[in-house]
Amino acid sequence: MLKKILIGIIGLFYLSCQSQLDIKGPYFANGIKNGWADQNSIVLWTRLTQNKSANFKGHPFIEISREKMKSLSENLDVEGIYNTQIPEGLSLKDMEGYCPGVSGEVQLHYFVKGQPEAAVVSDWTAVNPNKDFTHQWKLKQLQAGKNYRVKIYARPQKGQKISDSIFGQFLLPADENTPKHVKFCVVSCHDYNRRDDPENGHKIYPSMSQLQPDFYVHTGDIEYMDKPFPYAMTEELMRFKWNRLFALPFQRLFYNDHTSYFMKDDHDVGYDDSYPGKDYGTVTFERGLEIFDEEQFPTYSKRYKTIRWGKDLQIWIVEGRNYRNQNHLEDGPDKTIWGTAQKQWFFDTVNASDASYKVLITSSPILGPDRKNKNDNLSNSGYSYEQEEILNFIKKQNNLFIVNGDRHWQYVTHIKNTKLWEFGCGAGADVHAGGWKQEDFRPEHQFLRVKGGFLSVTVNSGSEPNIKFTHHDVDGQPVNEVVF
């Protein structure tokens, strides 16, 4: 239970000194993540680890063929899943990126920037070993538009000294009556094995930090469970991949310091184009969702939310996996990705909004174009009914734009003589880009670049507000801009 106490700078200094003592963990190798921020609330996440960092000097995994992977998955061959990917005589703890969790207790301190004397301090709480040694705090009654500072402490158990501490911060959105310039970044599709800085992670993270965004959105495919090194066909291997990725310095530092919204897509929960009934090895589709929603990321009762960021901007974050049915069903009014409740919520909240600019953020395309062989998103022919239903609604709105992830190329699509615009942010590294040919520039394309990077969106408030969509390369350099 959170309790408010006055705590001075001397007290904070004392706790910091304690944390420097030679104590063997637990530590915060996976840092802090936050999620679902609105004007008055946010969710904070952390995990306790045995070591200060992951074992990035461990042994490499063995690559097996995709055919072998599929056989192991279909036959639920747990012994084979490990023995074919881990060298003989070794175990998972010997492998590159191993970052085991550990039991212990955590305590949260947070305060409005510049007001450490009014810090709110939580009780010491044990992390949950059944949820990968993680813990979450749901903070409420916060102040809109304020920047908060965070410090979390760790100790092995009650009565023992502090073993580690970690700093972080987050910014809450201003209320709907406050004019405010807002900038945010959107990314998609990057995993550990396709990072472009082997020592640190993905270069887009320091590049985005240079822009000083107010918040950040990851549209999903954060990690690929169905890619090698290793193929994660058990819960243990899924957790291994999450823990390894979030121990990378670039990722960890960025998440500690920025308000974030984490979405999911197919590869995060199992196999490519996953849906109910499409399990991956020993991990059911539903369990993959649960590990993402309840364990590895900040938790929210619904996986969709709309957030007002000041007078001129409102965003909609929609969920593309939890409420869908099977891809192979015949198209029609009952076939869905969004689900009936989420879809009606979107229509109702957009109609109720008076924001100057509205941005729908989705894990996968609605307009496209996409590849002909795909049948997993609203731009594909297998979902034409629901696509038309949503686009017919968007056509009637003013200044409502679609931003999406999933596709491994950057693009801007506009359907002439309509209000339909879609901005694909692209993959997080050049090595991850592909799936489309640069020369395949369609009539609806306003911009096309088969390279990695990210998207930034800037809303300038005032008497004549505007919104700017900028595609960046991995180093942060602008490669395309569209202003409305």
Residue ranges: model-predicted function:
Residues 20-484:
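Metal-dependent phosphoester/phosphodiester hydrolase catalytic core
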Residues 1-23:
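Bacterial Sec-dependent N-terminal signal peptides
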